Amino acid sequence: MCSTKKPIKLDLCASVKLTPFKPMRPPKPMQCWIHPRRANCKVTRPRNNYSDPDNENDMLHMTVLNSVFLNEHAKLYYRHLLRNDQAEARKTILNADSVYECMLIRPIRTEHFRSVDEAGEHNMSVLKIIIDAVIKYIGKLADDEYILIADRMYVDLIYSEFRAIILPQSAYIIKGDYAESDSESGQSVDVCNELEYPWKLITANNCIVSTDESRQSQYIYRTFLLYNTVLTAILKQNNPFDVIAENTSISIIVRNLGSCPNNKDRVKCCDLNYGGVPPGHVMCPPREITKKFFHYAKWVRNPNKYKRYSELIARQSETGGGSASLRENVNNQLHARDVSQLHLLDWENFMGEFSSYFGLHAHNV
């Protein structure tokens, strides 16, 4: 008879069925005059500042997020990139499975903040403030870091004619570990484990394998976040690409928008309702790679399946040979690998036109 005792397993069902106690009362009602169409944020003015002429315009903005967007230090992932914060102060309040992310905003006397949602912004100097804020924010990401934004496909912020403030994001920032073939020494480098001794003896950070194609895919995804943030700000209607929350197929959206009359391979965004003079065909993105962006964005639904999504945008098809020149098959059609290269080149040309229109330098995008 074996004398080894079996380990005791806890009843996981009890934890699943448990209703957590929330030490903080949920704020009611959830009303936000900056975001009237949202149900997860609230803005209020501190009453004790009404007698202070310097702070009478202070605003407290709170966003309710899910606790899954906390990192190993119980800090929201999006705050990892806040190096030069335009908000006066931020406070994270944990409430069981909810996170209340609060911001103190201190406007100057003539400053008025607006959301990018259906803003219809047409002032080019203000748009450059928005663009600069987005570039500086996502520019803090390291080469082996991967940002994935849930619920929307743009960087959420509020802005005025003087500055832009990054709002709380439902986002992951996943650390990558260079693959063996990518490391200079030919050996796997352990850059992932950031825990200190002795805690790293118990557990380690969960990293994905970082490859050339995964890093390229992530970089291109970031450029789409920039483009879509600007599109959201200049539209006076709902962004047609805001389909993640509604769980609508991107193929249906692209088909409903139609093809741009100037280029049949691009999505027709030239006839949308803009706040100012329509920008022509500058905002009409390439169709095929736009679909890839939204397939790539599904990664946020299951971050552990990085092998399926991390290289999706820049991944070369295995169809066809390995020649660098464009090849044609018996039907006079390009091989799938060459087509994917052309899609990437088309996106690069599109972002070049985008940068020229908004007066950006190529190295900033």
UniProtKB/Swiss-Prot annotation:
UniProt-listed InterPro entries: Baculo_VP1054
- Enumerate the subcellular locations listed in this protein's record, separating them with semicolons: Virion
Output the superkingdom of the source species. Answer: Viruses
Q: Does the keyword Magnesium apply?
A: no
Could you tell me the keywords of this UniProt record? Virion
Signal sequence segment: none
Task: Give the GO cellular component terms, alphabetically.
Answer: virion component
Q: What is the protein's quaternary organization?
A: Interacts with C42 and VP80. Interacts with protein 38K.
Q: What does this protein do?
A: Structural protein that participates in nucleocapsid assembly. Plays an essential role in the proper localization of the major capsid protein VP39, and the minor capsid protein 38K into the capsid assembly site.
Put simply, this protein is called Protein AC54
